[in-house]
């Protein structure tokens, strides 16, 4: 499996199809953004596109062929090409969505690896069912930039509750991004792990860390 990051909360996951689907490749794109945020949007060529919430920096499906691409934009259970997706309702803020609306957490299973993308999670704590619905996670994609989401301290607390094998921070300030949020440094320091820096992250079930959590930071 290969994970690529386009900036902000946008990732592409490329994996082998599930055994029941065939022997080809499957591709999942999460939270494609508008060029208005200052970054170059990815071209959509994927089997599935997941939208965590309906804001311009997460919901740009322009150019997607809806005949071949499954667009998922809310809670529920989905499957295509042996990639299994579960959407879990959450809130974009600490006031039950009254400030910024709803957010969908996605749990994706492919190649026997479980990836959780938290979207613009803004709650200060999980509701009772949410942690159970998320379940065991191998790779956690977690917002850390604050202001519109949880901040770096809250992100560390959320990570400690989910207990993933790998953490990939997202939704933080990078060059050219026009959104005013924090960079990743405070989160990295608070977490206390030295990041493995990558251009693309290649991972297999057999290579997942067993004892210690790993922090992966995209260049």
Language-model features, listed with the residues they occupy:
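Short Gly/Ser/Thr- and charged-rich N-terminal loops/segments
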Residues: 18-25
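Active-site-proximal beta-strand elements of phosphoester/diester hydrolases
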Residues: 2-5, 27-31, 84-91, 105-107, ...
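Portal/gating segments that form or line small-molecule/metal binding sites
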Residues: 63-116
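Binuclear metal-ion centers of metallo-dependent hydrolases, dominated by the metallo-beta-lactamase
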Residues: 3-6, 99-100, 166-219
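Active-site-proximal loop/helix segments of hydrolase catalytic cores
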Residues: 94-162
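Active-site metal-binding motif and surrounding structural segment of the metallo-beta-lactamase
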Residues: 34-77, 132-141
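Divalent metal-coordination and catalytic microenvironments
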Residues: 13, 49, 53, 85, ...
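Active-site metal-binding loops of divalent metal-dependent hydrolases
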Residues: 32-34, 54, 90-92, 119-123, ...
